[in-house]
Amino acid sequence: MLNCGDSSKDNNDFSDKDASSDAQKRYGIKSAVVEYIITGSQEGTKTLYFDKWGMRQAEYTRSVLTVSGFSKSINLVNIIDGDYQYMINIDQNSGTKTRNPILKSMDELKGQKGFNEFGEQMLLSIGANKIGKEEFLGKDCDIYEMRNIGTKLWVWKWITLKSETNSRGLEINVTATRINEGSVPKDKFTIPEKITLNEVDLDNIENEMREENK
């Protein structure tokens, strides 16, 4: 168990120089803040902060999910920074620390040249297929569909600006309302104080599951 207040203490942070090559770019812009509203079965807000071309990002989500008449409050922070990802439940002062899954995907797709190819391969790897184009918030978006989970994504420079999910009786829409390109305060990527983290090795879990299924 780890008590954390600063993610920079236990990861190898990417410098701007490291992220300057296309091989270290998730998104097509260097840094921005994107604000969203969440509607449907889940209602609330989400804010995405990122810099270093998406190699460092934080998502703050506050919402209420209603299923079959029962409601649950959601207050989550998801930080990706350097070697690690931190998924934090603010209300419970707890979370998990795992290896950064983006780095694993980049290694698997290292034959792709340029963020355009990498971004598309990332979407294809999760079962998304491009079905069209549409302007949204003044941006030219590509529309991708994941039929297996009933989701459509509106993607601009590999940033999802809008998503619609309709699956198993749940309808959840996440819609960007504002995009502010420019620098992001560093404290947005800092783990809140008094959070207890449980470190989880997802690779070990996957390997154990494979062994059990043999």
Over which residues does each language-model region extend?
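Extended soluble regions of mature proteins
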Residues: 9-214
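Bacterial signal peptide processing site
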Residues: 4-7
